[in-house]
Amino acid sequence: MRRLAAAVCVLLILATGLSGCGERTGLDPKHPVTLTLWHNFGGTMQTTMDELVDTFNATVGRERGILLSVTSISGSASVQEKLTMIAAGDPGAPEMPDLSVCYPSTAVLLKEKGLLASLDGQFTAEELDAYLPRFVEEGRLSDGQLFVFPFAKSTEVLFVNQTLFNRFSAATGVTLESLSTFEGLSAACLRYYEWTDGLTPDVPGDGQWFYTADSLFNLAQVGMEQLGTTLFDGEALRLDDPAYRRVWDVIARPAVMGGYAVYDGYSSDLSKTGKIICSTGSTAGITFYGDQITYDDNTTEPVEYTVLPFPTFDQGEKIAIQRGNGMVVARSTPEKEEAAALVLKGFTAPEQNMKFVSSTGYLPVTKDAFENSVEAEIAANDNPNIQKLLRTAVKVYEEYNFYIPPVFDRFNALSGGYEEERLSALSGARSRYLELAETMAPEEAYDAAMEGVFEAFVSR
Protein backbone atom coordinates (compact mmCIF):
# COMPACT_ATOMS: atom_id res chain seq x y z
CA MET A 1 0.00 0.00 0.00
CA ARG A 2 2.87 2.40 0.78
CA ARG A 3 4.29 1.86 -2.72
CA LEU A 4 0.93 2.52 -4.33
CA ALA A 5 0.39 5.63 -2.24
CA ALA A 6 3.82 6.94 -3.19
CA ALA A 7 3.10 6.37 -6.87
CA VAL A 8 -0.23 8.20 -6.62
CA CYS A 9 1.44 11.12 -4.83
CA VAL A 10 4.02 11.48 -7.58
CA LEU A 11 1.36 11.38 -10.26
CA LEU A 12 -0.67 14.03 -8.45
CA ILE A 13 2.43 16.23 -8.41
CA LEU A 14 2.73 15.63 -12.13
CA ALA A 15 -0.90 16.58 -12.56
CA THR A 16 -0.52 19.94 -10.86
CA GLY A 17 2.92 21.03 -11.97
CA LEU A 18 4.19 19.17 -15.01
CA SER A 19 3.77 20.95 -18.30
CA GLY A 20 7.17 20.66 -20.00
CA CYS A 21 8.39 23.39 -22.33
CA GLY A 22 6.35 26.23 -23.64
CA GLU A 23 2.99 27.54 -22.60
CA ARG A 24 0.16 25.45 -21.28
CA THR A 25 -2.35 24.50 -23.93
CA GLY A 26 -6.06 24.04 -23.63
CA LEU A 27 -6.32 20.88 -21.54
CA ASP A 28 -9.49 21.17 -19.50
CA PRO A 29 -10.84 18.55 -17.05
CA LYS A 30 -14.35 19.71 -17.90
CA HIS A 31 -13.77 18.81 -21.55
CA PRO A 32 -11.38 15.82 -21.45
CA VAL A 33 -9.51 14.56 -24.50
CA THR A 34 -9.39 10.84 -25.21
CA LEU A 35 -6.09 9.29 -26.26
CA THR A 36 -5.72 5.87 -27.85
CA LEU A 37 -2.71 3.74 -26.92
CA TRP A 38 -1.41 0.60 -28.62
CA HIS A 39 0.88 -1.87 -26.87
CA ASN A 40 1.81 -5.51 -27.31
CA PHE A 41 2.13 -6.65 -23.71
CA GLY A 42 0.28 -9.80 -22.73
CA GLY A 43 -0.16 -11.91 -19.61
CA THR A 44 1.26 -10.39 -16.45
CA MET A 45 2.72 -7.54 -18.51
CA GLN A 46 -0.77 -6.59 -19.70
CA THR A 47 -2.02 -6.65 -16.12
CA THR A 48 0.78 -4.28 -15.14
CA MET A 49 0.01 -1.98 -18.07
CA ASP A 50 -3.67 -1.96 -17.14
CA GLU A 51 -2.72 -0.87 -13.63
CA LEU A 52 -0.51 1.93 -14.97
CA VAL A 53 -3.33 3.13 -17.20
CA ASP A 54 -5.92 2.97 -14.42
CA THR A 55 -3.64 4.91 -12.07
CA PHE A 56 -2.96 7.55 -14.71
CA ASN A 57 -6.64 7.98 -15.54
CA ALA A 58 -7.50 8.32 -11.85
CA THR A 59 -4.79 10.91 -11.13
CA VAL A 60 -3.16 12.98 -13.87
CA GLY A 61 -5.93 12.15 -16.32
CA ARG A 62 -8.70 13.25 -13.99
CA GLU A 63 -6.90 16.43 -12.91
CA ARG A 64 -5.87 17.52 -16.41
CA GLY A 65 -8.72 16.18 -18.51
CA ILE A 66 -7.15 13.15 -20.21
CA LEU A 67 -8.75 9.75 -20.73
CA LEU A 68 -6.44 6.99 -21.90
CA SER A 69 -8.03 4.19 -23.93
CA VAL A 70 -5.86 1.13 -24.53
CA THR A 71 -5.73 -1.53 -27.24
CA SER A 72 -3.51 -4.55 -26.60
CA ILE A 73 -2.29 -6.13 -29.82
CA SER A 74 -0.88 -9.64 -29.71
CA GLY A 75 2.81 -9.56 -30.53
CA SER A 76 5.29 -6.80 -31.22
CA ALA A 77 5.49 -7.79 -34.87
CA SER A 78 1.74 -7.20 -35.29
CA VAL A 79 2.01 -3.69 -33.85
CA GLN A 80 4.91 -2.83 -36.13
CA GLU A 81 3.05 -4.30 -39.12
CA LYS A 82 -0.01 -2.16 -38.46
CA LEU A 83 2.11 0.95 -38.01
CA THR A 84 3.94 0.18 -41.25
CA MET A 85 0.59 -0.14 -43.04
CA ILE A 86 -0.40 3.27 -41.70
CA ALA A 87 2.88 4.80 -42.88
CA ALA A 88 2.41 3.28 -46.34
CA GLY A 89 -1.20 4.47 -46.56
CA ASP A 90 -2.37 0.94 -47.29
CA PRO A 91 -6.09 0.45 -47.95
CA GLY A 92 -7.64 -1.02 -44.84
CA ALA A 93 -4.90 0.31 -42.57
CA PRO A 94 -6.20 1.16 -39.08
CA GLU A 95 -6.34 4.71 -37.80
CA MET A 96 -3.11 5.98 -36.30
CA PRO A 97 -3.22 5.73 -32.48
CA ASP A 98 -2.31 8.75 -30.38
CA LEU A 99 0.43 6.75 -28.66
CA SER A 100 2.01 3.44 -29.54
CA VAL A 101 4.92 1.25 -28.63
CA CYS A 102 7.30 1.46 -31.57
CA TYR A 103 10.80 0.56 -32.69
CA PRO A 104 13.02 3.28 -34.18
CA SER A 105 13.06 1.52 -37.57
CA THR A 106 9.27 1.78 -37.77
CA ALA A 107 9.27 5.31 -36.39
CA VAL A 108 11.45 6.39 -39.31
CA LEU A 109 8.70 5.36 -41.74
CA LEU A 110 6.02 7.21 -39.77
CA LYS A 111 8.16 10.30 -39.35
CA GLU A 112 8.91 10.48 -43.09
CA LYS A 113 5.15 10.68 -43.71
CA GLY A 114 4.74 13.48 -41.17
CA LEU A 115 2.72 11.28 -38.84
CA LEU A 116 4.77 11.73 -35.66
CA ALA A 117 5.11 14.60 -33.22
CA SER A 118 8.56 15.66 -32.08
CA LEU A 119 8.79 15.35 -28.31
CA ASP A 120 11.55 17.88 -27.69
CA GLY A 121 9.08 20.70 -27.16
CA GLN A 122 7.22 18.74 -24.48
CA PHE A 123 10.23 18.17 -22.20
CA THR A 124 12.71 20.56 -20.64
CA ALA A 125 16.42 19.79 -20.89
CA GLU A 126 16.38 19.04 -17.18
CA GLU A 127 13.54 16.55 -17.60
CA LEU A 128 15.33 14.72 -20.43
CA ASP A 129 18.55 14.66 -18.43
CA ALA A 130 16.79 12.47 -15.87
CA TYR A 131 16.70 9.58 -18.37
CA LEU A 132 19.57 7.31 -19.36
CA PRO A 133 21.37 9.21 -22.14
CA ARG A 134 21.69 6.22 -24.47
CA PHE A 135 17.98 5.47 -24.15
CA VAL A 136 17.13 9.01 -25.21
CA GLU A 137 19.77 8.99 -27.93
CA GLU A 138 18.21 5.93 -29.55
CA GLY A 139 14.92 7.80 -29.89
CA ARG A 140 16.49 10.66 -31.83
CA LEU A 141 16.12 10.01 -35.54
CA SER A 142 18.37 11.21 -38.37
CA ASP A 143 17.45 14.89 -37.94
CA GLY A 144 18.34 14.79 -34.24
CA GLN A 145 14.78 15.27 -33.01
CA LEU A 146 13.31 13.03 -30.32
CA PHE A 147 10.48 10.92 -31.70
CA VAL A 148 10.76 7.61 -29.78
CA PHE A 149 10.51 8.01 -26.03
CA PRO A 150 12.19 5.36 -23.81
CA PHE A 151 9.74 3.01 -22.15
CA ALA A 152 10.12 -0.78 -22.44
CA LYS A 153 13.91 -0.96 -22.65
CA SER A 154 15.91 -4.13 -22.20
CA THR A 155 19.35 -5.58 -22.72
CA GLU A 156 20.69 -9.12 -23.07
CA VAL A 157 22.05 -11.17 -20.17
CA LEU A 158 23.18 -14.73 -19.53
CA PHE A 159 20.54 -16.92 -17.88
CA VAL A 160 22.04 -19.95 -16.08
CA ASN A 161 20.17 -22.94 -14.65
CA GLN A 162 22.18 -22.95 -11.43
CA THR A 163 20.80 -26.29 -10.25
CA LEU A 164 21.97 -28.21 -13.32
CA PHE A 165 25.17 -26.18 -13.59
CA ASN A 166 26.19 -27.09 -10.04
CA ARG A 167 26.30 -30.80 -10.95
CA PHE A 168 28.41 -30.09 -14.00
CA SER A 169 30.70 -27.78 -12.04
CA ALA A 170 31.21 -30.28 -9.22
CA ALA A 171 32.22 -32.97 -11.70
CA THR A 172 34.44 -30.89 -13.99
CA GLY A 173 35.60 -27.79 -12.12
CA VAL A 174 34.04 -25.40 -14.64
CA THR A 175 33.04 -22.22 -12.79
CA LEU A 176 30.47 -19.50 -13.30
CA GLU A 177 33.34 -17.04 -13.61
CA SER A 178 34.53 -18.84 -16.74
CA LEU A 179 31.22 -18.00 -18.41
CA SER A 180 32.00 -14.28 -18.27
CA THR A 181 33.80 -14.53 -21.63
CA PHE A 182 32.58 -16.04 -24.88
CA GLU A 183 35.79 -18.03 -25.11
CA GLY A 184 35.07 -19.54 -21.69
CA LEU A 185 31.46 -20.16 -22.63
CA SER A 186 32.52 -21.92 -25.83
CA ALA A 187 34.94 -24.14 -23.91
CA ALA A 188 32.24 -24.96 -21.36
CA CYS A 189 29.93 -26.06 -24.19
CA LEU A 190 32.50 -28.57 -25.43
CA ARG A 191 33.28 -29.78 -21.91
CA TYR A 192 29.60 -30.23 -21.06
CA TYR A 193 28.96 -32.21 -24.23
CA GLU A 194 31.93 -34.44 -23.42
CA TRP A 195 30.86 -34.87 -19.79
CA THR A 196 27.23 -35.71 -20.53
CA ASP A 197 28.28 -38.08 -23.29
CA GLY A 198 30.46 -39.90 -20.78
CA LEU A 199 27.52 -40.40 -18.41
CA THR A 200 26.16 -43.02 -20.80
CA PRO A 201 29.21 -44.97 -22.02
CA ASP A 202 27.01 -47.56 -23.69
CA VAL A 203 25.42 -44.85 -25.89
CA PRO A 204 28.22 -42.90 -27.59
CA GLY A 205 27.55 -39.52 -29.15
CA ASP A 206 24.58 -38.57 -26.97
CA GLY A 207 26.16 -35.55 -25.30
CA GLN A 208 23.84 -32.67 -24.46
CA TRP A 209 23.62 -28.98 -25.25
CA PHE A 210 24.97 -26.42 -22.84
CA TYR A 211 24.23 -23.02 -24.38
CA THR A 212 22.36 -21.17 -27.10
CA ALA A 213 21.85 -17.54 -28.08
CA ASP A 214 18.42 -16.14 -28.82
CA SER A 215 19.99 -13.90 -31.45
CA LEU A 216 23.25 -14.72 -33.22
CA PHE A 217 22.91 -11.40 -35.03
CA ASN A 218 22.85 -9.47 -31.76
CA LEU A 219 25.81 -11.50 -30.53
CA ALA A 220 27.71 -10.56 -33.69
CA GLN A 221 26.81 -6.87 -33.42
CA VAL A 222 27.85 -6.61 -29.79
CA GLY A 223 30.85 -8.89 -30.18
CA MET A 224 32.33 -6.72 -32.91
CA GLU A 225 31.79 -3.61 -30.77
CA GLN A 226 33.47 -5.31 -27.80
CA LEU A 227 36.45 -6.05 -30.05
CA GLY A 228 36.77 -2.40 -31.04
CA THR A 229 35.22 -2.51 -34.48
CA THR A 230 31.76 -2.68 -36.06
CA LEU A 231 29.68 -5.25 -37.90
CA PHE A 232 28.41 -2.68 -40.38
CA ASP A 233 29.77 -0.90 -43.41
CA GLY A 234 26.87 1.42 -44.17
CA GLU A 235 23.99 -0.97 -44.80
CA ALA A 236 26.24 -3.98 -45.49
CA LEU A 237 27.94 -6.42 -43.12
CA ARG A 238 31.71 -6.35 -42.57
CA LEU A 239 32.17 -10.09 -42.32
CA ASP A 240 35.66 -9.84 -43.82
CA ASP A 241 36.89 -7.93 -40.76
CA PRO A 242 39.50 -10.12 -38.97
CA ALA A 243 37.63 -9.63 -35.68
CA TYR A 244 34.58 -11.37 -37.10
CA ARG A 245 36.47 -14.65 -37.24
CA ARG A 246 36.57 -14.64 -33.43
CA VAL A 247 32.81 -14.03 -33.31
CA TRP A 248 32.30 -16.91 -35.73
CA ASP A 249 34.59 -19.40 -34.01
CA VAL A 250 33.20 -19.20 -30.46
CA ILE A 251 29.86 -20.44 -31.78
CA ALA A 252 30.93 -22.58 -34.73
CA ARG A 253 33.14 -25.00 -32.83
CA PRO A 254 30.62 -26.03 -30.12
CA ALA A 255 27.74 -25.92 -32.62
CA VAL A 256 29.50 -28.44 -34.85
CA MET A 257 31.33 -30.56 -32.26
CA GLY A 258 28.51 -30.49 -29.71
CA GLY A 259 27.38 -28.37 -26.79
CA TYR A 260 25.76 -25.43 -28.59
CA ALA A 261 22.08 -25.77 -29.54
CA VAL A 262 21.47 -24.82 -33.17
CA TYR A 263 17.85 -23.95 -32.55
CA ASP A 264 15.40 -21.69 -34.36
CA GLY A 265 13.24 -20.70 -31.42
CA TYR A 266 13.31 -19.13 -27.98
CA SER A 267 15.98 -20.43 -25.64
CA SER A 268 13.54 -20.36 -22.72
CA ASP A 269 11.69 -23.29 -24.34
CA LEU A 270 14.87 -25.38 -24.17
CA SER A 271 15.65 -24.19 -20.66
CA LYS A 272 12.21 -25.08 -19.32
CA THR A 273 12.72 -28.67 -20.48
CA GLY A 274 16.28 -29.03 -19.18
CA LYS A 275 17.78 -29.27 -22.66
CA ILE A 276 20.27 -26.44 -22.07
CA ILE A 277 22.08 -25.02 -19.07
CA CYS A 278 22.36 -21.39 -20.12
CA SER A 279 21.40 -18.89 -22.81
CA THR A 280 21.78 -15.26 -23.77
CA GLY A 281 18.56 -13.37 -24.31
CA SER A 282 16.51 -10.31 -23.44
CA THR A 283 16.03 -9.36 -19.82
CA ALA A 284 12.30 -9.31 -20.58
CA GLY A 285 12.56 -13.07 -21.10
CA ILE A 286 12.90 -13.57 -17.34
CA THR A 287 9.12 -13.85 -17.08
CA PHE A 288 9.30 -17.15 -19.00
CA TYR A 289 11.61 -18.77 -16.46
CA GLY A 290 9.91 -20.37 -13.50
CA ASP A 291 11.17 -22.45 -10.61
CA GLN A 292 11.02 -25.90 -12.18
CA ILE A 293 11.81 -27.75 -15.39
CA THR A 294 9.81 -30.50 -17.06
CA TYR A 295 11.73 -33.25 -18.80
CA ASP A 296 10.56 -35.11 -21.90
CA ASP A 297 9.26 -37.98 -19.76
CA ASN A 298 7.03 -35.47 -17.89
CA THR A 299 9.03 -35.68 -14.67
CA THR A 300 9.74 -32.33 -13.04
CA GLU A 301 12.55 -30.90 -10.98
CA PRO A 302 12.71 -27.69 -8.94
CA VAL A 303 15.54 -25.42 -10.11
CA GLU A 304 17.09 -22.06 -9.40
CA TYR A 305 18.43 -19.61 -11.97
CA THR A 306 21.35 -17.22 -11.89
CA VAL A 307 21.40 -14.09 -14.05
CA LEU A 308 24.81 -12.86 -15.22
CA PRO A 309 25.82 -9.86 -17.34
CA PHE A 310 26.25 -10.39 -21.07
CA PRO A 311 29.58 -12.14 -21.71
CA THR A 312 32.47 -10.29 -23.31
CA PHE A 313 35.21 -11.44 -25.63
CA ASP A 314 38.56 -11.93 -23.92
CA GLN A 315 40.21 -8.52 -23.51
CA GLY A 316 37.14 -6.90 -25.03
CA GLU A 317 35.21 -3.89 -23.77
CA LYS A 318 32.14 -4.38 -21.59
CA ILE A 319 29.36 -3.58 -24.04
CA ALA A 320 25.78 -4.86 -24.08
CA ILE A 321 23.02 -4.29 -26.59
CA GLN A 322 20.18 -1.88 -26.00
CA ARG A 323 16.90 -3.57 -26.90
CA GLY A 324 13.18 -3.05 -26.46
CA ASN A 325 10.90 -0.37 -27.77
CA GLY A 326 9.81 3.12 -26.92
CA MET A 327 6.64 5.08 -27.44
CA VAL A 328 5.76 7.45 -30.24
CA VAL A 329 3.16 10.22 -30.28
CA ALA A 330 0.98 10.90 -33.30
CA ARG A 331 1.09 14.36 -34.82
CA SER A 332 -2.19 15.91 -33.76
CA THR A 333 -3.63 18.91 -31.98
CA PRO A 334 -1.53 20.78 -29.39
CA GLU A 335 -3.89 19.53 -26.70
CA LYS A 336 -3.49 15.88 -27.65
CA GLU A 337 0.27 16.13 -28.04
CA GLU A 338 0.61 17.73 -24.61
CA ALA A 339 -1.70 15.10 -23.13
CA ALA A 340 0.36 12.31 -24.70
CA ALA A 341 3.55 13.79 -23.24
CA LEU A 342 1.94 13.78 -19.80
CA VAL A 343 1.19 10.08 -20.26
CA LEU A 344 4.85 9.42 -21.03
CA LYS A 345 5.97 11.42 -18.01
CA GLY A 346 3.51 9.60 -15.79
CA PHE A 347 4.45 6.13 -17.04
CA THR A 348 8.18 6.76 -16.63
CA ALA A 349 8.16 8.54 -13.28
CA PRO A 350 10.49 6.42 -11.10
CA GLU A 351 7.78 4.87 -8.90
CA GLN A 352 5.56 3.97 -11.84
CA ASN A 353 8.51 2.84 -13.93
CA MET A 354 9.67 0.51 -11.15
CA LYS A 355 6.18 -0.94 -10.93
CA PHE A 356 6.45 -1.84 -14.62
CA VAL A 357 10.02 -3.10 -14.27
CA SER A 358 9.28 -5.24 -11.22
CA SER A 359 6.92 -7.56 -13.08
CA THR A 360 8.21 -7.49 -16.66
CA GLY A 361 12.00 -7.80 -16.72
CA TYR A 362 12.44 -4.49 -18.55
CA LEU A 363 15.00 -1.98 -17.34
CA PRO A 364 14.44 1.27 -15.46
CA VAL A 365 14.66 4.20 -17.86
CA THR A 366 15.67 6.97 -15.45
CA LYS A 367 18.89 7.49 -13.52
CA ASP A 368 16.90 8.01 -10.32
CA ALA A 369 15.15 4.67 -10.68
CA PHE A 370 18.45 2.86 -11.25
CA GLU A 371 20.31 4.63 -8.48
CA ASN A 372 17.66 5.06 -5.81
CA SER A 373 14.78 2.64 -6.41
CA VAL A 374 16.20 -0.71 -7.50
CA GLU A 375 17.51 -1.81 -4.10
CA ALA A 376 14.15 -1.12 -2.48
CA GLU A 377 12.41 -3.07 -5.24
CA ILE A 378 14.76 -6.02 -4.78
CA ALA A 379 13.90 -6.09 -1.08
CA ALA A 380 10.16 -5.82 -1.74
CA ASN A 381 9.84 -8.16 -4.73
CA ASP A 382 8.89 -11.75 -3.93
CA ASN A 383 10.07 -13.18 -7.27
CA PRO A 384 13.67 -14.43 -6.86
CA ASN A 385 14.28 -14.35 -10.61
CA ILE A 386 13.30 -10.67 -10.80
CA GLN A 387 15.48 -9.95 -7.76
CA LYS A 388 18.50 -11.54 -9.45
CA LEU A 389 17.75 -9.78 -12.72
CA LEU A 390 17.59 -6.38 -11.04
CA ARG A 391 20.92 -6.94 -9.28
CA THR A 392 22.50 -7.79 -12.61
CA ALA A 393 20.80 -4.81 -14.26
CA VAL A 394 22.48 -2.51 -11.75
CA LYS A 395 25.85 -4.14 -12.48
CA VAL A 396 25.34 -3.63 -16.23
CA TYR A 397 24.27 -0.02 -15.63
CA GLU A 398 27.42 0.64 -13.60
CA GLU A 399 29.99 -1.28 -15.65
CA TYR A 400 28.79 -1.59 -19.25
CA ASN A 401 28.23 0.75 -22.16
CA PHE A 402 25.06 0.28 -24.18
CA TYR A 403 25.31 -0.36 -27.91
CA ILE A 404 22.57 1.07 -30.13
CA PRO A 405 21.93 -0.85 -33.38
CA PRO A 406 21.79 1.29 -36.53
CA VAL A 407 18.48 2.24 -38.13
CA PHE A 408 17.95 1.74 -41.86
CA ASP A 409 15.25 0.24 -44.06
CA ARG A 410 17.01 -3.07 -44.73
CA PHE A 411 18.03 -3.71 -41.13
CA ASN A 412 15.35 -6.29 -40.31
CA ALA A 413 15.87 -8.13 -43.60
CA LEU A 414 19.62 -8.13 -43.02
CA SER A 415 19.19 -9.46 -39.50
CA GLY A 416 16.75 -12.17 -40.55
CA GLY A 417 18.93 -13.27 -43.45
CA TYR A 418 22.00 -13.49 -41.23
CA GLU A 419 20.20 -15.63 -38.64
CA GLU A 420 18.73 -18.00 -41.22
CA GLU A 421 21.96 -18.50 -43.16
CA ARG A 422 24.12 -18.83 -40.06
CA LEU A 423 21.86 -21.50 -38.58
CA SER A 424 21.74 -23.33 -41.91
CA ALA A 425 25.53 -23.27 -42.24
CA LEU A 426 26.04 -24.58 -38.71
CA SER A 427 23.36 -27.25 -39.03
CA GLY A 428 24.85 -28.54 -42.27
CA ALA A 429 28.35 -28.63 -40.81
CA ARG A 430 27.08 -30.49 -37.74
CA SER A 431 25.53 -33.19 -39.92
CA ARG A 432 28.77 -33.60 -41.87
CA TYR A 433 30.78 -33.71 -38.67
CA LEU A 434 28.70 -36.54 -37.23
CA GLU A 435 29.25 -38.60 -40.36
CA LEU A 436 32.99 -37.89 -40.49
CA ALA A 437 33.50 -38.49 -36.77
CA GLU A 438 32.65 -42.14 -37.27
CA THR A 439 36.00 -42.66 -39.00
CA MET A 440 38.07 -39.60 -38.01
CA ALA A 441 39.43 -38.07 -34.84
CA PRO A 442 37.23 -35.18 -33.55
CA GLU A 443 39.56 -32.33 -34.60
CA GLU A 444 40.18 -33.89 -37.99
CA ALA A 445 36.45 -34.37 -38.50
CA TYR A 446 35.77 -30.77 -37.45
CA ASP A 447 38.31 -29.36 -39.89
CA ALA A 448 36.88 -31.45 -42.72
CA ALA A 449 33.26 -30.59 -41.89
CA MET A 450 34.05 -26.87 -41.76
CA GLU A 451 36.15 -26.74 -44.90
CA GLY A 452 34.99 -23.74 -46.94
CA VAL A 453 31.98 -23.05 -44.67
CA PHE A 454 33.27 -19.79 -43.20
CA GLU A 455 34.51 -18.55 -46.57
CA ALA A 456 31.17 -19.31 -48.23
CA PHE A 457 29.24 -17.56 -45.45
CA VAL A 458 31.41 -14.45 -45.52
CA SER A 459 31.19 -14.10 -49.31
CA ARG A 460 27.46 -14.81 -49.56
Where are these regions (language model features)?
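Short, polar/charged alpha-helical segment
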Residues: 43-67, 108
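Conserved C-terminal helix/tail region of periplasmic/extracytoplasmic solute-binding proteins
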Residues: 380, 387, 391-460
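Extracytoplasmic/periplasmic solute-binding protein
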Residues: 145-151, 156, 183-236
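Hinge/lid segment of periplasmic solute-binding proteins
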Residues: 101-157, 186, 201-204, 300-311
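Extracytoplasmic "Venus flytrap"/periplasmic binding protein-like
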Residues: 61-134, 167-168, 277-278, 296-299
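Extracytoplasmic/periplasmic substrate-recognition and gating elements
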Residues: 88, 253-256, 296-369
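Glycine-centered hinge/linker elements that transmit conformational signals in sensory
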Residues: 186-193, 233-264, 305, 310
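Short, solvent-exposed loop/beta-turn-alpha elements that line the ligand-binding surface or hinge
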Residues: 120-131, 174-178, 203-204, 209-210, ...
